[in-house]
């Protein structure tokens, strides 16, 4: 049976494999997602300059949902999309962070798409 340590190491290895292929620019930044047990985090990153352009998470003050469920993840997706559109960013590259595209990760992506991001 897999232990939690094995799972996190496997996720990190998957993420490194994916990161070899996915790259964000200023025109099309990388939408990076991280999921913990209690919260979910999303940020748009310009990999050329190594800067975070926009960030949103369920741990922010003023967040109305619960970060450990799908509804909260969808709200975070909408929040990051609204902040990105304010800065004039519409197209992004989605980086699931080594997590399976299912559940909270999928809901965050759908929330960002509904709010206007294109990926």
From Swiss-Prot:
Coiled coil: none annotated. The keyword Endoplasmic reticulum does not apply. One of its GO terms (cellular component) is cytosolic large ribosomal subunit. GO terms for molecular function: 5S rRNA binding; structural constituent of ribosome. InterPro entries: Ribosomal_uL18_bac-type, Ribosomal_uL18_bac/euk. It comes from the Bacteria. SUPFAM superfamilies: Translational machinery components. This is one of the proteins that bind and probably mediate the attachment of the 5S RNA into the large ribosomal subunit, where it forms part of the central protuberance. This is Large ribosomal subunit protein uL18. It comes from Clostridium botulinum (strain 657 / Type Ba4). The lineage of its organism: Bacteria, Bacillati, Bacillota, Clostridia, Eubacteriales. The gene is rplR.
């Amino acid at each position: 049976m897999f232990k939690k340590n094995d799972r996190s190491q496997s996720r990190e290895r998957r993420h490194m494999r994916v990161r070899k292929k996915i790259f964000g620019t200023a025109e099309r930044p990388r939408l990076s997602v991280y999921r913990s047990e209690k919260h979910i985090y999303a940020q748009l990153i310009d990999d050329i300059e190594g800067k975070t352009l926009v960030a949103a998470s369920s741990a922010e003050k003023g967040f109305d949902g619960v970060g450990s469920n799908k509804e909260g993840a969808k709200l975070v997706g909408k929040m990051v999309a609204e902040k990105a559109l304010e800065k004039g960013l519409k197209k992004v590259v989605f980086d699931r962070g080594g997590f399976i595209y299912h559940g909270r990760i999928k809901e965050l992506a759908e929330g960002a798409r509904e709010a206007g991001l294109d990926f």
